[in-house]
């Protein structure tokens, strides 16, 4: 849950606890955000409304639309935000060969968002500044639309017209923006709740849920989040390390697969290069490899939240204590 607190007493005006997995994920995303943008925060045990819990303390003023978009650009790699790849190609390529020009134009037209800005403009090898100016002048809009269509929509509601609650303050009794929790409180029935108890569903909305996407680790099709709502420092450490280990293990697996494919191609008399983009590794395989090698960073069994891009809901896995001993 999130609370307004006295800034004069605590040095911050907002406190948030990991009351369920949505708030745990939001806290993890907020921690990435605060660290990247060097904003002040504190993790502290407090008693609020007669509830003693571990809280993340921060100031509302440190969360702005502009900072959020800047964070998105810093957080995600070039293969996720293609405009970053285009900028890198234009800024650091010394000689624009026909093949490179073709590749840049391919990236420029790689998604609907970029097509809207470059419908009448193509790169010809001489108009680098013009392309970069378009990207720079429309950067935040490009980031926002790319993020909503490729990433945010996997975790929060975005309709066919691109409308969402991104950047919107939560209103009283407004439906939750998180996928699978989008119930109308005014019409909420027992059928929406576990064991037919209407109070068992936490359907309230909160603007901090906009930070949920950053908490998940994986690939473009499936992601996971390790939920520890007992200790925020352990929650932070586990998910930060998961992100690091996942990247390392993914690179290792892809390299192994590419080597095997290349060896097979050579045996068959083919001399075609194997592109990294043509190789995929399942999330479960990578995660199991991490558990075998890096169990030291997981302290005890816990809830794992899983999201498949093709499904409109989240799934829950459980990691038992005896499975990591």
For the regions a language model picked out, list residue spans one by one.
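Hydrophobic, Leu/Ile/Phe/Ala-enriched alpha-helical segments that form helix-helix packing faces
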Residues: 34, 146, 242, 246, ...
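Intrinsically disordered, low-complexity regulatory regions
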Residues: 252-325
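Proline-rich intrinsically disordered, low-complexity coils
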Residues: 77, 98, 175, 213, ...
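Conserved small-residue
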Residues: 1-152, 319
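Alpha-helical structural elements
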Residues: 16, 176-178, 312
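Basic, glycine-/proline-tolerant helical and adjacent loop/strand elements
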Residues: 102-259
